[in-house]
Amino acid sequence: MNIKSFLNNRLWKNNSSLVQLLGLCPVLAMTTNAINAIGLGMTTTLVLTITNTIISSFRKIIPKDLRIPIYMMIISSVVTSIEMLLHAYTFNLYQSLGIFIPLIVTNCIIVGRADLIAYKSSIVESFFDGIFIGLGSMFAMFAVGSIREILGNGTLFFGANKIISNIHSSVFFTLLDKKFTIILAVFPPGGFLILGFLIAIKNFIDLYYKKNTIKNIEQCSCSNKIK
């Protein structure tokens, strides 16, 4: 396994939110601030990692014709367990995420990776696939959530005590004065615009890198011909 290619594919090249555009409903609904984005991203990553590992462990005994219902049973069991843990230990985060915790069961990313990777790959590969696909999605959610929070409320990391309970609720950064904020950013249309902006930036970076790579190859081939 090429580790660099493995990481690049999952974190950047085939990012589930910025490239495959999977699971956009929770991405846009729960990224009104950075903390909610981190909370949902961590929960999704945990579900991905656990379900991938379980499905890969039992892949040889899961009947091919019944695999989708079995995936859903495993995923729903894992999500329910994590939901109960969030309710018990991080109640504020549980309240903020609300209905979007159980809706992780229907997230296309989870089912897609289960069938594409976990059902066909080793436990180790499936485990790390879950981690890095989840981190890639969390990175996108965090970027969208941070920009929306800064533009819409002028703050960053407001409500950090939802994740780290011993932090006081007054601990956050104020980056913009209220009179300079753009209220559209915290509403769904603003979320769509910011997500589109991030996708455009990613595509620009990819295109720039591709052009430079082609230019370097052409220069190398020309220098070899001269020699």
UniProtKB/Swiss-Prot annotation:
Cellular localisation: Cell inner membrane
Keyword Membrane: yes
EC number annotated for this UniProt entry: 7.-.-.-
Membrane-spanning segments: 34-56, 68-88, 91-111, 127-147, 181-201
UniProt keyword Transport, yes or no: yes
Keyword list, A-Z: Cell inner membrane, Cell membrane, Electron transport, Membrane, Translocase, Transmembrane, Transmembrane helix, Transport
Enzyme class, UniProt record, top EC level: translocase
GO biological process, one term: electron transport chain
Domain of life (superkingdom): Bacteria
Cellular component terms per the entry's GO annotation: plasma membrane
Topology versus the membrane: Multi-pass membrane protein
Family per record: Belongs to the NqrDE/RnfAE family.
HAMAP family per UniProt: RsxE_RnfE
Quaternary state and interactors: The complex is composed of six subunits: RnfA, RnfB, RnfC, RnfD, RnfE and RnfG.
Role, per record: Part of a membrane-bound complex that couples electron transfer with translocation of ions across the membrane.
Protein name, as recorded: Ion-translocating oxidoreductase complex subunit E
